[in-house]
Swiss-Prot record:
It is linked to Defects in F9 are the cause of hemophilia B (HEMB). Ca(2+) 5 binds at E65, E69. The modification (3R)-3-hydroxyaspartate is found at D103. The modification Phosphoserine is found at S107, S198. Ca(2+) 8 binds at E272, N274, E279, E282. This is Coagulation factor IX. Activated by factor XIa, which excises the activation peptide. The propeptide can also be removed by snake venom protease. Activated by coagulation factor VIIa-tissue factor (F7-F3) complex in calcium-dependent manner. The iron and 2-oxoglutarate dependent 3-hydroxylation of aspartate and asparagine is (R) stereospecific within EGF domains. Its main location: secreted. The modification 4-carboxyglutamate is found at E46, E47, E54, E56, E59, E60, E65, E66, E69, E72, E75, E79. Its EC number is 3.4.21.22. The lineage of its organism: Eukaryota, Metazoa, Chordata, Craniata, Vertebrata. GO terms for cellular component: extracellular space. It comes from Canis lupus familiaris.
């Protein structure tokens, strides 16, 4: 029995020794067996996981200093900390128009691409949208940011968007105190800008039948107040008040070419209001030179390129009753015209074949779309002309108003957009007034008159 018991003891000891040899492995094999598999960590924090970050800040709450020990870099720690404290504020993609979102603690910042501003890059500040919020002219600078500018005689205000007078009597501005301006403001109209193809080839015909009447009138208009249209001038020649015109600067007036007759002496009267009495605001000047547009040819068509310049013998004295009209560049002259309505003025006939007005008349006329304009007449409407007026008739420019202004007001400043040219009768139903489109001649005007 004792022998059997000893044999069992020896066997157990041998088994334990063999088992011990199987349990204790070398270091390399033991590391393979005992290494903990990496736990999956989803989301933006994965890129920050280094060293003990997961143990320090994900499995447990950590402080900024503890996270700093892991990153060993303040900038990277700060980026991690912004998301760690309150989550990713950029997760909802709040930045519009391809803006880049940068997360922050309890907030975010949008880095906007050129042409956009605002908390979420929601404001389009390119010139194509509401004129870049500029009150007159807009262009993009070298960095693609909006740069506002003003016409001659004005300067940018502190907001760098509005324009304020830089001279005592700047163009297009009514300065007579008692006149209350009720014209349409342009700030809500810039969003409707419609750019016309300025390279469109003009239609030229060799023989065109002439319409019955020059436009020398404002039919259905209202009496203007003294100084309400201080750029308006009266032309006297063989007869008085045969045409109108507009002051460009102290030495030059623009009118219609068909108003000019060879060898006929012309005088202009600026500051005129009531032709039947002297009001001590009038200034008379002699015309010493006339310049017809180089494309004007009355033998082919009396009203095509119907524009002329008159040089005065002495400069006009600018004041509240004698003020030049503003002339924009070609692009903006066309844009302003497309605002949809303008003002015409003159001393022409107050009804068809009737008497001429003694007091300056004015009328607000809507722009007529080109298709309607073409359908309204058998005569040729060239691309350098436009139609304005009322389909129902009763209101129009008329005989005696030719050469006078069609102006568009922009933020209280009036710009020349047309010249009264011709029409079929006056104020007839279904007929419109035809005007010379000033945008086509801006460069020529500025070149000849040295207008800046």
């Amino acid at each position: 029995m004792a022998e059997a018991s000893g044999l069992v003891t020896v066997c157990l000891l041998g088994y334990l020794l063999s088992a011990e040899c199987a349990v204790f492995l070398d270091r390399e094999n033991a590391t393979k067996i005992l290494s903990r598999p990496k736990r999956y960590n989803s989301g933006k924090l994965e890129e920050f996981v280094r060293g003990n970050l997961e143990r320090e800040c994900i499995e447990e709450k950590c402080s900024f200093e503890e996270a700093r020990e892991v990153f060993e870099n303040t900038e990277k720690t700060t980026e991690f900390w912004k998301q760690y404290v309150d989550g990713d504020q950029c997760e909802s993609n709040p930045c519009l128009n391809d803006g880049v979102c940068k997360d922050d603690i309890n907030s975010y910042e949008c880095w906007c691409r050129a042409g956009f501003e605002g908390k979420n890059c929601e404001l389009d500040v390119t010139c194509n949208i509401k004129n870049g919020r500029c009150k007159q002219f807009c262009k993009l600078g070298p960095d693609n940011k909006v740069v506002c500018s003003c016409t001659t005689g004005y300067q940018l205000a502190e907001d760098q968007r509005s324009c304020e007078p830089a001279v005592p009597f700047p163009c297009g501005r009514v300065s007579v105190p008692h006149i209350s301006m009720t014209r349409t403001r342009a700030e809500t109209l810039f969003s409707n800008m419609d750019y016309e193809n300025s390279t469109e080839v003009e239609k030229i015909l060799d023989n065109v039948t002439q319409p019955l009447n020059d436009f020398t009138r404002v039919v259905g208009g209202k009496d203007a107040k003294p100084g309400q249209f201080p750029w308006q001038v009266l032309l006297n020649g063989k007869v008085d008040a045969f045409c109108g015109g507009s002051i460009i600067n102290e030495k030059w007036v623009v009118t219609a070419a068909h108003c000019i007759e060879p060898d006929v002496k012309i005088t202009i009267v600026a500051g005129e209001h009531n032709t039947e009495k002297r009001e001590h605001t009038e200034q008379k000047r002699n015309v010493i030179r006339t310049i017809l547009h180089h494309s004007y040819n009355a033998t082919i068509n009396k009203y095509n390129h119907d524009i002329a310049l008159l040089e005065l013998d002495e400069p006009l004295t600018l004041n509240s009753y004698v003020t030049p009209i503003c002339i924009a560049d070609r692009e903006y002259s066309n844009i302003f015209l497309k605002f949809g309505s303008g003002y015409v003025s003159g001393w022409g006939r107050v009804f068809n074949k009737g008497r001429s007005a003694s007091i300056l008349q004015y009328l607000k006329v809507p722009l007529v779309d080109r298709a309607t304009c073409l359908r309204s007449t058998k005569f040729t409407i060239y691309n350098n002309m436009f139609c304005a007026g009322f389909h129902e008739g009763g209101k129009d420019s008329c005989q005696g108003d030719s050469g006078g202004p069609h102006v568009t007001e922009v933020e209280g400043i009036s710009f020349l957009t047309g010249i009264i040219s011709w029409g079929e009768e006056c104020a007839m139903k279904g007929k419109y007034g035809i005007y010379t489109k000033v945008s086509r001649y801006v460069n020529w005007i500025k070149e000849k008159t040295k207008l800046t």
